[in-house]
């Protein structure tokens, strides 16, 4: 079965380009991905860096303003957030932001949403971080506000957590009826139900082929109960990748690239690594489990030859 490929920039920490402007490097990577045939580029929406990726004090530009700048710097490639915590911004303001970026990009935006999980990040910025049940209900209401603001001439929504009244959002997004919504997370009772009810895509944060197949089976069940189309939901997986010609290069790269906030077993568990042949075999197992779209990330993404090798030697096998 075919699969598509997007690229995530998990960080704006570029050790081999430390003296360059961080956004300039990110833009160069995005433009290279566009030239190589990647379908999309994704940015994390965090307020500062998370330790399993890089030190907290490393640069991490704000997601949506960066996506707007990337939209103005590209012509074809789709652009998305992976993912935005519902509690970071008022959903009515986020609707305005995303509508604008969809106009700037001429209809290339994908809006990734999640409930949020970094309690210390919310607290550092003075944002509420309620218990998980409340965060899930706020996520659902936030999506409802987005849909209202994107599609209604004057939006009104009365929820427990969010309200908009006769709100005008103009210009509307280019994409009709609205930009696609991606929901991230593997929560089986609520997250997957929200995907089944509202979203056009779902992101699996990782997992073995067997785990992915099981989670997608739960999603299918939610779709059946709600009467929505499981096949119309794009099944994506965040997939860190590390190219290595042999075990010696693999060990050396792990030593160099494993973040201080992680460890080698965790790094190996979440990263698909090896030669193009070995990586392709591992990706094929995930395709067989139901994954349709890989959002790959490279720990050394600023070394653009990695992107070129992957695009030349791996991506065509899934065309």
Predicted feature residues:
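Active-site-adjacent structural elements that line small-molecule/cofactor binding pockets in enzymes
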Residues: 1-319
């Amino acid at each position: 079965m075919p699969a598509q490929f997007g690229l995530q920039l998990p960080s704006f920490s570029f050790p081999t380009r430390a003296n360059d402007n961080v956004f300039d490097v990110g833009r160069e990577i995005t433009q290279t991905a566009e030239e190589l045939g990647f379908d999309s580029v994704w940015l994390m929406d965090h307020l500062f860096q998370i330790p399993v990726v890089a030190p907290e004090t490393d640069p991490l530009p704000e997601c949506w303003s960066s996506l707007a700048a990337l939209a103005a710097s590209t012509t074809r490639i789709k652009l998305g957030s992976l993912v935005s915590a519902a509690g970071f911004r008022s959903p009515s303001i986020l609707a305005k932001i995303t509508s604008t970026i969809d106009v700037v990009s001429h209809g290339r935006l994908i809006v990734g949403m999640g409930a949020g999980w970094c309690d210390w990040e919310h607290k550092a910025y003075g944002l509420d971080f309620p218990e998980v049940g409340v965060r899930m209900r706020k996520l659902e209401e936030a999506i409802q506000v987005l849909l209202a603001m994107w599609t209604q001439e004057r939006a009104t929504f009365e929820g427990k957590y969010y309200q908009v009244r006769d709100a005008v959002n103009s210009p509307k997004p280019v994409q009709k009826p609205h930009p696609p919504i991606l929901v991230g997370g593997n929560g089986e009772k609520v997250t997957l139900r929200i995907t089944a009810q509202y979203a056009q895509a779902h992101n699996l944060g990782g997992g073995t082929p067997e785990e992915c197949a099981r989670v997608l089976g739960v999603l299918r069940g939610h779709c059946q109960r709600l009467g929505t189309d499981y096949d119309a939901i794009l099944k994506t997986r965040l997939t860190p990748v590390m190219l290595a010609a042999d075990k010696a290069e693999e060990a050396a790269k792990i030593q160099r690239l494993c973040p201080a906030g992680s460890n080698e077993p965790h790094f190996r568990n979440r990263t698909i690594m090896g030669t193009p042949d070995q990586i392709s075999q591992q990706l094929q197992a995930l395709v067989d489990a139901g994954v349709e779209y890989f959002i790959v990330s490279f720990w050394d993404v600023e070394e653009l030859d990695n992107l070129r090798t992957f695009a030349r030697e791996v991506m065509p096998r899934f065309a």
